[in-house]
Amino acid sequence: MTELSALSAAPARTRDGVLRFYFGPMDCGKSTLALQMNYNHRRQGRHGLVLTKHDRSGGPRVTSRIGLGSDAVEVVDDLDLVALVRKHERVDYVICDEACFYTVAQIEQLADLTDDFGIDVYAFGLASDFRSQMFPAAQRLFELADEISRLQVEVLCWCGRPGRLNARVVGGALVRTGEQVVIGDIGDAPIRYQVLCRRHYRSGSLGQD
């Protein structure tokens, strides 16, 4: 086979995909934007998948704090995202909510979907955990994404300064040790999360006095 015929036999791609990462603290509208983006793409006749992991609803759904929601595929650690997409006849884009909780291998798979299959991938998530340390998946997204956007919806600390860090609160006190991923803010759960400015995150002040 000549070089020219080999190129002719290669699968044609009409366009390149893009991998975008949208990040910000809690309450900045990440899930709301993910749902809006899915709605906009579907209106244009595009076919997509919506993925999530550890959504506050406890089920395979993307839900926002303002009451919006959509069914989604629940991402578990051993789910191969390339294999998932290839099971479908047509996928133009993938919405990945709570992408900070994915495995690093799954972030690599998202890049594969973009580079090898021309699929647009839109990932949404936190950058850092309750210890103010970056999630491994978020770090890999910062390294691989074509475009990175910090969401501009203003989230405030109790003092009025911009909220930047996600504090874990147990029994009314800020904690800095424990498992990286613990779901809170659900019903009467003893664990909740609060967005703080850097000053009050470091001092541990929750503004309750």
Give the ranges of each region predicted by the language model.
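Residue-level preference for the first positions of well-ordered beta-strands
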Residues: 19-21, 47-49, 92-95, 120-122
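A short acidic, amphipathic alpha-helical/loop segment
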Residues: 37, 105-113, 137
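Sensor-1/coupling segment of RecA-like P-loop NTPase cores
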Residues: 114-137
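Short recognition patches in nucleic-acid-associated and regulatory proteins
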Residues: 153-185
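Walker B catalytic acidic pair
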Residues: 97-99, 125-126
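Short basic (Lys/Arg) and small-residue
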Residues: 145
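Conserved P-loop
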Residues: 2-85, 129-140, 153, 177-209
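Catalytic P-loop NTPase motifs of RecA-like helicase/translocase cores
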Residues: 101-103, 130
